[in-house]
């Protein structure tokens, strides 16, 4: 579906903003170029509504209503370009992020916490990878940023050559994919046209319209989108200064039958700011620490950090499960402190489970403390079951009046890599207010 999450703020123009036409005889070369240190203030807004077919577990399918709106305001500084001179890294400083939606009558809100409002955004092809410099992002924060339009990726809306008024060209596929948020773009018939070049508020400004259809696959499945919009291009600073999009997303099932329809409006207002001088300290790189995610839920009595290649698959008041692959998983349980008076009791219970499953133990470790984390102990076994060689790693963590156990599994071939992931997760567990 179209996931642009901001409320349309202005469509009318104030009296001093009326355009004054220029000569129609010229040819125009309209394109953006970027340099490290370029800065923009960007304000985006979305409003959407519609319905889609939803199938709850073990229940019949039903149509649910969807409404949403959002407003986002941030400064973006260009950090680096790739070999084709496209922006592949930028620094964002958010002033405002507000997203709300109603899904089947349930209200949902997403915000950016103050400690993650400065972040770096990496772009690799159509993928956007944000990470914060101050604290781990939650999955909702990550999803919010990576599904927002990246204005620097809209160069395909500009003509690939010099054009005259009313001349048309096909929109670039990369820009269509950016606007539609399709994970796989299968076809595009989006056409752009230079409508006018006018003096707008005493600045030479080009208006480019775009209209058409695009089809592909997003997280909801097969999808067709209908686009109708326009952009303003500031001919003096040579940057996209405004975008308006009216879009319709038609959701389809595997047979190609329509199962939902969502309509929305999206705007980008973009102002060029004075450039800044970058130093080597400004070229931030992702690493295992700054790309971690934060798991924190009202339903669960603890929080923890985890790598992005892991996925939280279930949660309850006292448990959370994570998967990294088909053969790598982790179960975290908040225990009653009286259940295990020693780590040896937990090890004996785990050993009984291993024997019940008829696993053959090939190697085992003693119970050991984790350096630097008081109250955290671990033990492990290398086992074989049904021809598979697995590594089982367990933790007991006592912190204050709380106790946690962790049980994990992975293949023996991957244990060196995954062991450090699981150790990091265990080290990061913290009881929340709900646990007290």
What kind of region is each of these model predictions?
Residues 6-23:
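N-terminal export signals
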Residues 301, 412, 416-420:
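Soluble non-cytosolic domains of exported or imported proteins
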Residues 349-403:
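Signature of long, low-cysteine stretches enriched in small and polar/charged residues
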Residues 26-28, 153-157:
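Short alpha-helix capping/helix-loop boundary micro-motifs
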Residues 298-354, 382-386:
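Secretory pathway targeting signatures of secreted, lumenal, and periplasmic proteins
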Residues 24-115, 121, 163, 171-291, ...:
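Acidic, serine/threonine-rich low-complexity disordered tracts
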């Amino acid at each position: 579906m179209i996931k642009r999450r901001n409320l349309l703020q202005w469509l009318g123009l104030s009296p001093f903003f009326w355009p004054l036409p220029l000569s129609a005889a010229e040819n125009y070369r309209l394109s953006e170029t970027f340099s490290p240190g370029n800065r923009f203030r960007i304000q985006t807004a979305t409003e959407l509504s519609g319905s889609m077919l939803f199938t709850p577990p073990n229940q019949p399918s039903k149509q649910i209503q969807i409404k949403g709106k959002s407003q986002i305001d941030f400064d973006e500084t260009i950090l680096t370009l790739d070999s084709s001179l496209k922006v592949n890294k930028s620094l964002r400083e958010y002033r405002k992020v507000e997203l709300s939606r109603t899904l089947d009558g349930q209200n949902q809100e997403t915000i950016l916490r103050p400690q993650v409002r400065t972040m770096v955004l990496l772009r690799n092809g159509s993928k956007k990878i944000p990470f914060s410099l101050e604290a781990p992002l939650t999955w909702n924060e990550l999803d919010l940023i990576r599904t927002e339009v990246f204005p620097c990726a809209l160069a395909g809306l500009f003509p690939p050559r010099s054009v005259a008024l009313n001349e048309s060209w096909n929109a670039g596929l990369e820009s269509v994919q950016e606007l539609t948020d399709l994970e796989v773009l299968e076809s595009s018939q989006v056409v752009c046209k230079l409508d006018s070049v006018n003096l707008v508020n005493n600045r030479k400004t080009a208006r480019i319209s775009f209209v058409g259809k695009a089809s592909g696959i997003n997280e909801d499945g097969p999808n067709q989108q209908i686009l109708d919009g326009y952009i303003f291009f500031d001919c003096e600073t040579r940057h996209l200064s405004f975008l308006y999009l009216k879009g319709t997303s038609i959701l389809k099932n595997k047979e190609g039958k329509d199962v939902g329809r969502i309509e929305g409006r999206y705007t980008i207002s973009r102002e060029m700011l004075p450039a800044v001088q970058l130093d080597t300290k400004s070229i931030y790189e992702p690493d295992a620490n700054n790309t971690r995610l934060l798991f924190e839920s009202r339903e669960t009595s603890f929080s923890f950090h985890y790598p992005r290649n892991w996925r939280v698959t279930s949660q309850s008041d006292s448990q959370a499960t994570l998967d990294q692959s088909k053969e790598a998983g982790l179960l975290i349980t908040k225990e009653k402190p009286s259940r295990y008076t020693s780590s040896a009791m937990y090890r004996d219970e785990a050993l009984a489970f291993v024997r019940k499953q008829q696993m053959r133990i090939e190697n085992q470790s003693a119970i050991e403390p984790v350096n630097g984390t008081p109250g955290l102990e671990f033990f492990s076994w290398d086992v074989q079951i049904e021809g598979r060689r697995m590594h089982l790693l367990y933790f007991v963590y006592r912190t204050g009046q709380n106790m946690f156990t962790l049980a994990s599994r992975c293949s023996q071939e991957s244990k060196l890599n995954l062991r450090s992931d699981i150790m990091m997760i265990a080290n990061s567990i913290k009881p929340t207010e709900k646990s007290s």
